[in-house]
Amino acid sequence: MKCPYCSYNESKVVDSRSTEDSISIRRRRECLECGKRYTTYEKIESVPILVIKKNLNREYFDRDKIVNGMIKACQKRPVSRQQIEEIVDEIEKKINNSMITEVKSEYIGELIMEKLKDIDEVSYVRFASVYRQFKDINTFMEEIKKLKDREL
């Protein structure tokens, strides 16, 4: 591991422990040249997941795309970046645990909407309007009615 301070290639591990989510290992290292300490993280490389788009094209799962879409839907709403990251973590974990290598974009969209519905209904409707391509105000009203009926 290359030292970030002096670029020397050898170091020793001073401390090693699992992270809270148990999907990576945090290591404290000490450079054998300059003696400075730094932290590294090791993560198991997962099998790449392909997303099948509506037009049947395939592309690699892109976590940032999901995060950015959710940020837009949650803009000026009481939803923190941390909440968004946690939702995406849960979705990514669910897909990885299913042991499938291809997943439809519709499935991912439904998972996102399911999570948003529970934390902020306005963000949910915003996301759904883009994802489901609402054509007019009536489509919005139908979705809002479903939310209201759910509360009763």
From Swiss-Prot:
A zinc finger (unnamed) spans 3-34. InterPro entries: ATP-cone_dom, NrdR-like_N, RNR_NrdR-like. Binds 1 zinc ion. Keywords: ATP-binding, DNA-binding, Metal-binding, Nucleotide-binding, Repressor, Transcription, Transcription regulation, Zinc, Zinc-finger. GO terms for biological process: negative regulation of DNA-templated transcription. The keyword Transcription regulation applies. GO terms for molecular function: ATP binding; DNA binding; zinc ion binding. Residues 49-139 form the ATP-cone domain. Disulfide bonds: none annotated. The keyword Zinc-finger applies. Its cofactor is Zn(2+). It holds the Pfam family ATP-cone. It comes from the Bacteria. Negatively regulates transcription of bacterial ribonucleotide reductase nrd genes and operons by binding to NrdR-boxes. NCBIfam families: transcriptional regulator NrdR (TIGR00244). Belongs to the NrdR family. This is Transcriptional repressor NrdR. It comes from Clostridium tetani (strain Massachusetts / E88).
